[in-house]
């Protein structure tokens, strides 16, 4: 299904950039500039500067949509430092960007910073030792404490707090960018955005206003998941279960003329909030109670006994109390059974001072007074003791461990309080919309495919709409004001909205049209909506922000829908799903064609690495110790969707590989010389053609792997061939290649240059620095805009070759080397006689001279038999006496 653009369209200035594609297989004369002692030292800074100056990674927006590959780059959260997990997943994306660029695509590869929201606020609070208090007036001369104390934070105005957030995020972003550049990300930094900048705020506010106009966004006063530490609402997607100790308390409810009814609860402090008891309609034990009432202990409130299918006969005593609100099941029961509300927990997580409606008895109010003002934990302790004294606690609490819901960034269990919030419909209460969004998930190409299931499970399990408002400070404000009646009360049903041309707006500091600032907060005047958008409400619009939706229609038409969304598996339910929702509403299509999902980085104990767990490793030390290419090698060795351990051994291997590329390239170029032409027609020898035949298979496999978003397979295949080339082929042809006069020598030299050019380009997406360095020794331009290798470049020579020739010849050479090694002889030691037996002996015979020279063999005998296994007998030369 195509996208349907909404809203006005205009003209935008078109800015193009140079993008060259270089064919290395030419007959041009050239000079080599090979250093005497190649080294990795200094090449990163050197090439980062060159790439910046040349604009080699600039997006060419003059290209048509078919010629563009657009990436919806994840904007990392700017709240401290990057960790090695970021390097892991962003390297995956960069290999794709580089491959597509070498395939002739103009790559739209922007970078964003997710710099608004709670993580930034927490960092600012701890870094400067401050906290936001909106009741404090702005101080234009405020300076943060010289010695910040996170435990004794200085209260400051909202405006002062936001200024500190802006100041610190700018500094953090500079550090992030320097690390990304050092890693070699081929980002076009001209297209950088921040989720709190004016462009992002305008996009977020515009999308919200359109959602509101179409009925996709709405305000409701309802039970809300609430973090009492941060005093903000929390969405379903931000929850996590944590195992916590608790206890089942058996509590007696009383009824006239009958035995008490025993319920079991982990939250006895909610007894004053009890509005009913509930059991399963098929539970025979409680059939006679349905439709009757019982009295709550201590408080004496009459509550009905009701039936509902969600009651679990196997849990506790099979009958439970419904409180407003202990958990989301309470909310479901309250809503479906149309029960009253008796809220007792405030926004601060303490028991509110006034007893709830219905608690009328003197004894009940006296009992409640003992709880008022207490934290939930303290109230629980007090009420258990009160129940014990009254005889309504049956037995002692039974200790258990059970899952408790937390805000993913919070330290205390969530509560449910009634608040007024903004929501966007997401299918949680609309089966038709749910099916439409599930269909979007089916339209999307997932890499790996099994990640689709996580999306479907999340959408299928939604139990409410997406809560997008937050009671915080540093975020995108809702573009809404409310008129005040003659008593100064907000008229929420008649919001005042800005025109899109006025965006972005800040209702906390700007007056709406038709009002003046001195009418703020006064009867007959107005107030601004005090809340900000959840950070995902902005991040869900990254394709629109980066692509210039409405602000740059020409660019947007060229990049949207984007080609790829790369991201982590843990934010499928948040970032990926929310972006699908916004695009479905605004454009009636997916925001991208493909999703590439990275796995997690694990610490040495195989635990997920995360800032909250304190087990993260920052990348800078690894980059300095091993080099950027080495760290990229480790990252690229991890497949999409697969959890990967931080492994410095892999980085050491990557560094060794980069050094080997330097040295092998120097050797090959010194052997080939400047007069050699990389001409496939000059490749005439069986071993050379065989090597190119194997290389052709590598090119085909690596190319197919990249098209399937399997960068690891492309790297493994390329690396395996490279080491075989260095260990076997180079040794086999070394003597012949040094012969300047013979056709056989020219064949080896031409084959070497062809292989070198192809390998440099195959390695380029993974090891950008070392490949650019060696490419510059003998080629014009950048390897990163050179054409991705194709078998067509050397097809004639490859098709004339038999891969079995190189395999058989290499095996013979391995056996000869092994014999020398076991005899503790130098590899230059003479060999008297080598006899080769088996079906492959004939292939090895074709390379007799190369084998004799490489193995220093005096006599070579080939005996072709029907044996499938190649057998090699080695007779070493007699030791000198």
Curated annotation (Swiss-Prot):
Region (Disordered) residue spans: 493-526
Protein name in UniProt: Valine--tRNA ligase
Compartment annotation: Cytoplasm
Motif extent ('KMSKS' region): 608-612
Summary of the function given for this chain in its UniProt record: Catalyzes the attachment of valine to tRNA(Val). As ValRS can inadvertently accommodate and process structurally similar amino acids such as threonine, to avoid such errors, it has a 'posttransfer' editing activity that hydrolyzes mischarged Thr-tRNA(Val) in a tRNA-dependent manner.
Annotated PANTHER family: VALINE--TRNA LIGASE, CHLOROPLASTIC_MITOCHONDRIAL 2 (PTHR11946:SF93), VALYL-TRNA SYNTHETASES (PTHR11946)
CDD domains, per the entry: Anticodon_Ia_Val
Any one GO CC term of the record: cytosol
GO BP terms: valyl-tRNA aminoacylation
Subunit comment: Monomer.
Annotated ATP binding sites: 611
Motif window: 'HIGH' region: 76-86
Family that this chain belongs to: Belongs to the class-I aminoacyl-tRNA synthetase family. ValS type 2 subfamily.
Top-level enzyme category: ligase
Recorded catalytic activity of this chain's protein: tRNA(Val) + L-valine + ATP = L-valyl-tRNA(Val) + AMP + diphosphate
Record note on domains: ValRS has two distinct active sites: one for aminoacylation and one for editing. The misactivated threonine is translocated from the active site to the editing site.
Organism superkingdom: Bacteria
InterPro entries the UniProt entry points to: aa-tRNA-synth_I_CS, aa-tRNA-synth_Ia, Anticodon_Ia_Val, M/V/L/I-tRNA-synth_anticd-bd, Rossmann-like_a/b/a_fold, tRNAsynth_Ia_anticodon-bd, Val/Leu/Ile-tRNA-synth_edit, Valine-tRNA_ligase_type_2
Coiled coil: none
An example Gene Ontology molecular-function term: valine-tRNA ligase activity
Keywords recorded for this protein, A-Z: Aminoacyl-tRNA synthetase, ATP-binding, Cytoplasm, Ligase, Nucleotide-binding, Protein biosynthesis
